[in-house]
């Protein structure tokens, strides 16, 4: 965003004010002044200490209206599952050739799905995939024999999230071009899932802050009352 446009957006935003979710969505759409279809992101500050394994918040959620992004998917599997993966819409399908490509530095996909019987080989590239959030994981549904279901869910808008070292959770929840109602439904689905996953070991206030932002826009705070756990 150009300097003047960003300053104009800041001028329209009270950084101390918390908005109802519907109003926050309207505000973020109003102040986003870019010539492309900007992504809207949500950030939550959680009252957890991720240094403790029993306070790590991690999960997946199906956004009712998707993210608006075309997601590229690699399925790593043996030949018996390849046709099923292709039919489900996977962009790349294979086994040893993709392990080798990744070893050589290729990571040109958004999501990797794998069958359990190839995880031993895929472990060779865990140090490459892990830091990029691409390593398949049973908890997120990306290690499975039902590759067709996994591919279809990811393509339809299933996203994965995980708390970072500072106790924050970030996720894309749609595009500025979405209807406000669609964004509200996506955001509500995300918030409810994060609240549902509150660790029993977490003490004090769990949801400490919620904010929306779009590509290169200031953030807009969201009232927490309906989502406090």
Curated annotation (Swiss-Prot):
GO terms of molecular function: rRNA binding; structural constituent of ribosome; tRNA binding
Cellular component terms (Gene Ontology): large ribosomal subunit
GO biological process: regulation of translation; translation
Sections of the chain in a coiled coil: none
Superkingdom of origin: Bacteria
UniProt cross-references to Gene3D superfamilies, sorted A to Z: 3.30.190.20, 3.40.50.790
Mitochondrion as UniProt keyword: no
Parts of the chain that traverse the membrane: none
InterPro entries, per database record: Ribosom_uL1_bac-type, Ribosomal_uL1, Ribosomal_uL1-like, Ribosomal_uL1/biogenesis, Ribosomal_uL1_3-a/b-sand, Ribosomal_uL1_CS
Stored Pfam families: Ribosomal_L1
The UniProt record lists the keyword Ribonucleoprotein: yes
Keywords per UniProt: Repressor, Ribonucleoprotein, Ribosomal protein, RNA-binding, rRNA-binding, Translation regulation, tRNA-binding
Subunit structure: Part of the 50S ribosomal subunit.
Family, per entry: Belongs to the universal ribosomal protein uL1 family.
Full protein name: Large ribosomal subunit protein uL1
